[in-house]
Amino acid sequence: MASQQFPPQNQETQPGKEHAMDPRPEAIIQSYKPANKLKDKVAIVTGGDSGIGRAVCLCFALEGATVAFTYVKGQEEKDAEETLRALRDIRARTGAKDPMAIPADLGYDDNCRKVVDEVAGAYGGAIDILVNNAAEQYERPSITDITEDDLERVFRTNIFSYFFMSKHAVKRMRDRRGGAGAGGCSIINTSSINAYKGNKTLLDYTATKGAIVAFTRALALQLAEEGIRVNGVAPGPIWTPLIPASFAEEKVRQFGSQVPMGRAGQPSEVAPSFVFLASDDASYMSGQMLHVNGGVIVNG
């Protein structure tokens, strides 16, 4: 496939706004055929207002799930409203419960507890699926450019939130033992190709993504006997709001051209991997990472 280029563009705030992107990311691939794989399940998706998170929310809803998602208050209301509206349109066809959009700073334990409690309270105590997806990244050429505050911020969003959300969701998932289907409950963590290949200008971000891989493997071992599966997806270059919010215009223009397929992926091409891992189709999988990255060969 020929190399693809995007129009030069830049956004000044993280994690970026999907409604301001050109072109807009694709959330649902046109050929997608839902099959009720997640019917009667309750899912939480962090960072679900845009990008990969939005695509996961919509695919889960198409598969019959009731979906709640989080977003950053004061920055992502418009994207969150778009996602919530799309979820309600789908819900009218599937008969799932009304979706929820929850503003939250997930870098802190108590905030994560409140999100989980709010979702469980709204849906009769049930949580079957947790997708940890919230992330931010900042391009910096040298380790000496990263302050202690910078490091803490990225780690709080990218890995602390995964730990805290999982900690509180697991308490609810344990109550679902025997009622969540053959595949049990599922936690799915979004890592990155950078965890495997490295990225010299995204040092702190890359470190968090490596931590997510290790966290996924360890938690999978801890929860295996409890009927809770823990897996992850490590996307390659995907066209999401994080890209124009992270990089200079020229880098955005060339984004994704370095992979064997010669182009960036769309969120619509990543979301089906989350559906698979959340569904009973993956009932014998835990501790694994799926690599949706345009043909880059990685180990692990």
Swiss-Prot record:
Residues 1-14 have a biased composition (Polar residues). Its EC number is 1.1.1.-. Residues 1-23 are annotated as: Disordered. It is an enzyme of class 1 (oxidoreductase). The active site is at Y205 (proton acceptor). InterPro entries: NAD(P)-bd_dom_sf, Sc_DH/Rdtase_CS, SDR_fam. GO terms for molecular function: oxidoreductase activity, acting on CH-OH group of donors. Gene3D superfamilies: NAD(P)-binding Rossmann-like Domain (3.40.50.720). Pfam families: adh_short_C2. PROSITE patterns: ADH_SHORT. Keywords: Oxidoreductase. NAD(+) binds at residues 44-68. Substrate binds at S192. May act as a short alcohol-polyol-sugar dehydrogenase possibly related to carbohydrate metabolism and the acquisition of desiccation tolerance. May also be involved in signal transduction. Belongs to the short-chain dehydrogenases/reductases (SDR) family. This is Glucose and ribitol dehydrogenase homolog. It comes from Oryza sativa subsp. japonica (Rice). The lineage of its organism: Eukaryota, Viridiplantae, Streptophyta, Embryophyta, Tracheophyta.
